[in-house]
Amino acid sequence: MPSFDVVSELDKHEVTNAVDNAIKELDRRYDLKGKGTFEFKELTVTLTAEADFQLEAMIEILKLALVKRKIDAKCLEIKDAYASGKLMKQEVTLREGIDKELAKKIVAHIKEAKLKVQAAIQGEQVRVTGKKRDDLQEAIAALRAYDSGMPLQFNNFRD
């Protein structure tokens, strides 16, 4: 039976490149020159600046750099800014993987669409199986139209 997996993955190398591009853009911006920094560790970016409006501008720079590298900005989890001495800090976490709650919503959406496919949760991915390839393509189209709050990719397509 044909099947495919629904996953949410990030290319860590592209994320690193996007953060590096954001750092370069920060150095080029006249209004932010020398006033803010990006620190990248694993999948967390810490933004440091003197004021809230600078943090907002830095988040926009980061989002733009990620989109240029073909990474969906939906994967960002932006936490509240907090004061650290004279500076303001804010953490941005890049989310990866499908948690159980989102997996249940994806399975429910596929069932609501009344397609001739079955969906099963397997860890951090959802396996969709059907009798025909056309049914799977309809399921992919339905999931692309569905706003899950996370970027979804489809891989491991088997006939």
UniProtKB/Swiss-Prot annotation:
Q: Which organism is it from?
A: Pseudomonas savastanoi pv. phaseolicola (strain 1448A / Race 6) (Pseudomonas syringae pv. phaseolicola (strain 1448A / Race 6))
Print the keywords alphabetically.
Nucleotide-binding
- Respond yes or no to whether keyword Protein transport is given for this record: no
Q: Which family does it belong to?
A: Belongs to the YajQ family.
Under the cellular component aspect of Gene Ontology, which terms does the record hold?
Answer: cytosol
Keyword Membrane listed? The answer is: no
Q: Disulfide pairs?
A: none
Q: Which InterPro entries match?
A: DUF520 (IPR007551), UPF0234-like_C (IPR035571), UPF0234_N (IPR035570), YajQ-like_sf (IPR036183)
Q: What is this protein called?
A: Nucleotide-binding protein PSPPH_4093
Which is a Pfam family this sequence falls into?
Answer: DUF520
Record GO terms (molecular function): nucleotide binding
Q: What does this protein do?
A: Nucleotide-binding protein.
